[in-house]
Curated annotation (Swiss-Prot):
It comes from the Bacteria. GO terms for biological process: Gram-negative-bacterium-type cell outer membrane assembly; protein insertion into membrane. Part of the outer membrane protein assembly complex, which is involved in assembly and insertion of beta-barrel proteins into the outer membrane. A lipid is attached at residue 22 (N-palmitoyl cysteine). This is Outer membrane protein assembly factor BamB. Pfam families: PQQ_2.
Length: 384
């Protein structure tokens, strides 16, 4: 099946303020969310547990699964550790500040950032504050921690590395910023004493954790079009990192997979696919949700499209995730749509109990899929 893409409604991204006054998009029915038809549901999605943790979320408020627990935060300053088996809250800490991102977990710490351009490190076992430190500016990307370092990418695209023990700054990395860039749910990844992070104009870099030097750099998406808006492109979501390769998705760009050998990256394949969220992966298949609502499956080996579906056009989709042969994706009405991973058929639909859009990334675990809904409820769901 040939995958066809449409021009995207950029208002779903941070470019809203630039385009809001333009008459170009007025009365455009083609950007209206698709109405949902009834489907034959062959599976039942159940709530294993749910618990209220705070005041909603946003694209940067991604929960994390570690040590049989779910760590999460909400904008009102609440940070929690929840038992992944039953949803019981192990601890809840209320910081006297407004948070701008979800959690980073590693080295026995839980890291969050706030509107005052500070990072806070909490003890992962008790929730007590260990240290805090100043950032270059606010950060809406979740931090990441490991190998003795806490990494924060601020909204000026500066990457800073702090010591996990005391928050002391070790190094800083920055590139010249473009005129326009996206504010979306990009995330970092750690592998082999390096952090992989998106920087402006569609680039992805691997930085040595010891000193911040560049191990490698790839241009995952190239600017297109005559105007500043047409030329906006950035890597989105969390890159998929394998022992010998990395795959990325980008806005106004592609899904691209590279092989890594001796710190050199070679493109293996790419497929045009504009997305504002990250990729899903399972059993040698990559899953993407495009900016226009297309959901598609690609072969990891060569990028061949296994299936694609356009039932959810313009429904503001989350990142797709897989749990036990089913693909889950959330939308702007607080619904989870479930696909059969082999056929691409919609087999189930589930409301997360809030009509607000699901903006926090879905989180796959070995127990089910974790959802942080727009009303501040954390839940674990799975299909039976």
């Amino acid at each position: 099946m040939k995958l066809t893409l449409k021009r995207k409604f950029i208002a779903v991204l941070a470019l809203t303020s630039l385009l809001g006054a333009c008459s170009l998009f007025k009365n455009e029915r083609r950007f209206e969310p698709a109405k949902l038809a009834d489907i034959k549901q062959s599976i039942v999605v159940n709530t294993v547990w749910q618990t209220s943790i705070g005041s909603g979320g946003s694209a940067g408020f991604a929960p994390v699964y570690a040590d049989n627990s779910i760590f999460a935060a909400t904008p009102d300053g609440t940070v929690v550790r929840v038992n992944a088996e039953n949803g019981n809250i192990a601890w809840s800490t209320k910081l006297d500040t407004k948070l701008t991102s979800g959690v980073g977990v590693g080295d026995g710490l839980v890291i969050v950032t706030d509107r005052k351009a500070k990072a806070y490190a909490l003890n992962a076992q008790t929730g007590e504050k260990v240290w805090d430190t100043e950032l270059s500016t606010i950060s809406t990307m979740p931090p990441i921690a490991g190998f003795g370092k806490v990494i924060v990418r601020a909204d000026d695209f500066r990457v800073q590395a702090f010591d996990s023990k005391d928050g002391k700054l070790h190094w800083s990395f920055v590139r010249t910023n473009p005129i326009l860039s996206l504010k979306t749910n990009s995330r970092m990844a750690l592998i082999n004493n390096a952090v992989i992070v998106a920087v402006p104009t569609g680039k992805l870099v691997s930085l040595n954790l010891n000193d911040g030097t560049v191990n490698w750099e790839i241009h995952s998406a190239s600017a297109k079009g005559p105007s500043d808006i047409d030329s906006v492109t950035d890597v989105v979501g969390q890159p998929l990192v394998f022992n010998d390769g990395v795959c990325t998705s980008s806005y106004q760009g592609n899904i691209t997979c590279y092989s890594i050998k001796n710190s050199r990256l070679t493109p293996v394949w790419f497929e045009p696919f504009s997305s504002a969220v990250g990729l899903g992966y399972d059993n040698n298949i990559i899953y993407g949700a495009s900016i226009d609502g297309t959901v598609a499956a690609f072969s990891l080996a060569n990028g061949q499209i296994a299936w694609s579906d356009q039932t959810l056009i313009n429904r503001g989709l989350t990142n797709p995730v897989v749990y036990q042969n089913y693909l889950y994706v959330g939308d702007l009405d607080g619904l989870i749509h479930v696909y059969d991973t082999k056929s691409g058929s919609l087999v189930g639909r589930f409301s997360v109990g809030s009509s607000k859009d699901i903006v926090s990334p879905l989180l796959p675990t070995d127990k089910g899929v974790v959802v942080q809904n727009g009303s501040g409820t954390l839940m674990l769901i799975r299909a039976n």
